[in-house]
């Protein structure tokens, strides 16, 4: 009888182990490419109703201040006005609602005195924009914003996916701190221009702050009077331009001190038409000779020069 019980238990143990092995055999194992920075409270979804620009403005900013880290759904055909100083202090995803209709619009509007803030949105937390039309032209006067997005903190992740970004005078994205990640994906960016001072009209300006990653993928960028990216002589860990078209961009392509660069399958047309201190400058590539991270940068530099001859 005791032998029977022991035998039965042994069979049960073997069966349990076999199930455990089968259960683990086909399990998917995550790697770093599967991970994505999300709001700390991603299950929180907030629907934000549009502004009318008269009795209501800053509905999106108010919703973020009230609800914190979350996904914010904007109504299609709606406009969300930004008046005065708008600071996003939380990690947010801002996206259009599902269904038909025009993209939700985020647009600045001047105050009662006609004053327009220099920055449309300032970021202290990470932000992702999906299927949003962002226009930097004052809804009341038609005046252009100086800057659309200004990153105030370090380690911020800013991503645009399937967005349309239109109009500003100085730059679309400015960083005032280090180690940020900026991604532009499947988006159109146009009319970043100041004709009275063509040195302005930049897509991204690091303002001399080291960045982690700057990526432009499958985008259409046109009618910019200045640089696509202004690094300002600092190190960037990764800089990528892939599957994108650039047309009518005033300045040459500047790559300062990037540790890893990938430029693949792009079209550059009428780029670098603004006069330069050097003749026939299309690419400007700087090598961080004293940076210990730049082990293969000389090879990379040679490859880039070969590619663009």
Residue ranges and their predicted role:
Residues 2-11:
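Bacterial N-terminal signal peptides that target proteins for export
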Residues 77-78, 98-101, 273:
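Acidic glycine-/aspartate-rich tracts in secreted/extracellular proteins
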Residues 91, 125-136, 156-169, 179-195, ...:
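Right-handed parallel beta-helix
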Residues 118-120, 140-141, 145-150, 171-172, ...:
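Structural detector of coil-to-beta-strand junctions
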